[in-house]
Amino acid sequence: MPELPEVETVCRGLQENIIGKKIVKSWLSEKNLRFPYPENFINKLKNRYIVQISRRARYILIHMDNQEILLIHLGMTGKLNFYQNYDNHKIKHDHIIIRFSDNSALIYNDVRRFGFADILHISEQADNKMLKDLELEPLSEDFNVQYLQKKLAGKKMNIKNIMMDNKIVVGVGNIYINESLFLSRISPKKSANEVKKEELDMLIKNIKNILQKAINKGGSTLRDYQNLDGDVGNFQFDFRVYGREDKNCVDCKTKIQRIRQNGRSSFFCPSCQR
């Protein structure tokens, strides 16, 4: 599943390529995505200009000139492709095609169809069921040790799973919390209320640093992820623990272990992380 760095990379590509463009027509496949397409989807897009791109957690927000927003979530295997000169060629698993007046096109492709697209008015954003319960962005200044201490007070859940809860902080996916916990020398099994203030401070710094480095490298590509131009990310070559079960720890040479937590794989060094 694309995590925050991957979605941010896509948003930056959209910003470079579609701002100011006019939508002239759209096409939808006959197969629904995770949810049915909203009513009058195609008509709501027609003749609209793209004025802004933003991101909230793992959601892509394409703002139009009538104060409506095209909201996209990539799900597990979704990707957006941009074509400078589109030749009407559809490929397997294309589900949304948005054509612009200069003959360029934005195409949503999704093998497993776990992603979705919706259209909402900007006034509905705060109450939208997908967006309303989202907490702080991890790269924001407000995501600090004082905030996190309050959120974790009395919580006995393990620190790894709780840091992936959107009601604590958004967008810190499985890859990046594994890497951040390793750098912070915190075991993913440790109860959240047992993590000391100085450890939380280190964890926050590492989350911010890891996410920023991943963004700078275009995200991580494990299977399907690619950016708007079809290029893969490169941060996977910097993984210290994620996906490295039974390989030597880069710091102490102890074998990296993998356990299952809440249905997800956790990778850690039992010697370095306590």
Features from the language model and the residues they span:
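Generic detection of long, well-ordered alpha-helical segments
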Residues: 1-4, 88, 138, 142, ...
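A cross-family signal for N-terminal binding/gating loops and helix N-caps
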Residues: 1-109, 113-115, 248, 264-268, ...
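Phosphate/anion-contacting hairpin/loop surfaces
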Residues: 66, 70-171, 176-183, 191
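Basic, nucleic-acid-binding surfaces and adjacent catalytic neighborhoods in DNA/RNA-processing proteins
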Residues: 22-41, 54, 147-274
